């Protein structure tokens, strides 16, 4: 993909916003990509606030970077805590939740278009 023109966007003016309890996911389309900004409040957990049951897991892959806060991510063969500055690649079949009392913010470069999408 070649970039042929200068483009500038801000998450304060997103193309779409997906809201759910204790969180929101803002989407910006730019240069043929969809980039997402996730903001989750303390107490947020994917299986409780985005998934339809506590046993459900997120089946979207993610590639991104943590901006602030901390979040745990657990899959079939990993259990990690992500912190500011971490660059992450998370395969499908995982759960995640905010760790601590600070909001968690991350940018998503892969999987943003599918994440928390209305069915």
Where would I find each of the regions flagged by the language model?
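Short acidic-glycine-tyrosine-enriched beta hairpin
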Residues: 75-94
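A short, N-terminal "cap"/entry segment at the start of jelly-roll beta-barrel domains
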Residues: 1-39, 47
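Conserved GNAT-family N-acetyltransferase fold
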Residues: 38-40, 64, 88
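Short beta-strand segments in beta-sandwich/barrel cores
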Residues: 45-46, 69-74, 96
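A short hydrophobic beta-strand segment most commonly corresponding to one strand
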Residues: 38, 90, 94-95, 100-119
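Glycine- and acidic-residue-biased ligand/ion/polar-headgroup-sensing regions
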Residues: 33, 51-53, 57-77
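Conserved short histidine dyad/triad with adjacent acidic residue
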Residues: 37-57
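A short, compositionally biased micro-patch
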Residues: 30-33, 66, 91, 99-101
């Amino acid at each position: 993909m070649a970039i042929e023109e200068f483009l500038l966007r801000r998450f304060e003016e997103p193309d779409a916003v997906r809201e759910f309890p204790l969180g929101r996911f803002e989407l910006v389309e730019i240069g043929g990509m969809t980039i997402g900004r996730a903001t989750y409040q303390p107490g947020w957990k994917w299986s409780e606030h985005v998934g339809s049951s506590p046993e459900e897991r997120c089946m979207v892959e993610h590639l991104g970077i943590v901006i602030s806060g901390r979040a745990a991510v657990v899959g079939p063969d990993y259990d990690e805590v992500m912190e500011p500055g971490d660059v992450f690649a998370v395969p499908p079949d995982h759960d995640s939740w905010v760790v601590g009392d600070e909001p968690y913010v991350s940018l998503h470069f892969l999987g943003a278009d599918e994440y928390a999408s209305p069915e």
